[in-house]
């Protein structure tokens, strides 16, 4: 290696932040046989949703008297149904130890990411308040071609408008609203960074999944809605998705 190369090495990698839509499975009981049966029923309702889907296993909602989790067996059942476990969320010592034993990352329990810090009062010099900067609003992203199965389209910082059909297995994501002027047969996730005022509009509700700010319904639930197949507007009230006719 020359002296110039050793002093100025060419980088071989980059570390970048990324926003991914990841499903969280909150386990209520450790009965893996029942889990296997219920997962099979879910897969039958929305097979495209369970195709190599990244998953966080949440064990922090288990009751204190619930028995130990067969974590390798749990991961194996999820994999058989198309769910790929990336990490677990846990607070019981035995669950954390089991995850470490199979080399799975352990995330903090739900609600444990923030901690209260007692403030130290420091008298700061008075400043003239500055006018807050205008929010950066990105233009609406408009898609005019059909969205095929396996495609993922993301409108960062704004709304997404699709004026063509959306096929099963396709995924639409937006920080703001989603408009689909055609049949919506894939997945639509609006307000993915937590905007609870985001909405979903579509001319024909036939979706595998709809979600606003993390609250979602799958096709199994949507098919029971009397507005299935109709033009609808979807909004969020608390943690409930409201579907009304357009």
UniProtKB/Swiss-Prot annotation:
It comes from the Bacteria. The lineage of its organism: Bacteria, Pseudomonadati, Pseudomonadota, Gammaproteobacteria, Pseudomonadales. This is Probable septum site-determining protein MinC. Belongs to the MinC family. PANTHER family: SEPTUM SITE-DETERMINING PROTEIN MINC. One of its GO terms (biological process) is regulation of cell septum assembly. Interacts with MinD and FtsZ. Cell division inhibitor that blocks the formation of polar Z ring septums. Rapidly oscillates between the poles of the cell to destabilize FtsZ filaments that have formed before they mature into polar Z rings. Prevents FtsZ polymerization. Keywords: Cell cycle, Cell division, Septation. Pfam families: MinC_C, MinC_N. It comes from Pseudomonas savastanoi pv. phaseolicola (strain 1448A / Race 6).
């Amino acid at each position: 290696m020359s002296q110039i190369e050793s002093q100025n090495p060419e980088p071989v990698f980059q570390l970048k932040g990324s926003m991914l839509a990841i499903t969280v499975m909150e386990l209520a009981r450790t009965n893996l046989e029942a889990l296997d049966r219920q997962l099979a029923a879910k897969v039958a309702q929305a097979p495209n949703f369970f195709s190599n889907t990244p998953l966080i296993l949440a064990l922090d909602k288990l009751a204190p008297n619930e028995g130990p989790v067969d974590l390798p067996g749990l991961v194996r059942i999820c994999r058989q149904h198309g769910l790929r476990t990336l990490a677990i969320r846990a607070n019981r010592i035995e669950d954390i130890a089991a995850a470490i034993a199979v080399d799975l990352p352990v995330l903090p329990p739900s609600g444990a990411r923030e901690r209260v810090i007692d403030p130290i009062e420091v008298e700061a010099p008075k400043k003239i308040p500055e006018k807050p900067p205008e929010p950066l609003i990105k233009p609406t992203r408009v898609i005019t071609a059909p969205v095929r199965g396996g495609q993922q389209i993301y409108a960062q910082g704004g709304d997404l408008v699709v004026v063509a059909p959306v096929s099963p297995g396709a995924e639409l994501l937006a920080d703001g609203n989603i408009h689909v002027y055609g049949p919506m047969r894939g997945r639509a996730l609006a307000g993915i960074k937590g905007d609870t005022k985001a909405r979903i509009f579509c001319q024909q509700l036939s979706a595998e999944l709809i979600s606003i700010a993390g609250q979602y319904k799958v096709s199994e639930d949507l098919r029971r809605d009397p507005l299935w197949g109709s033009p609808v507007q979807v909004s969020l009230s608390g943690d409930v998705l409201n579907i009304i006719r357009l």
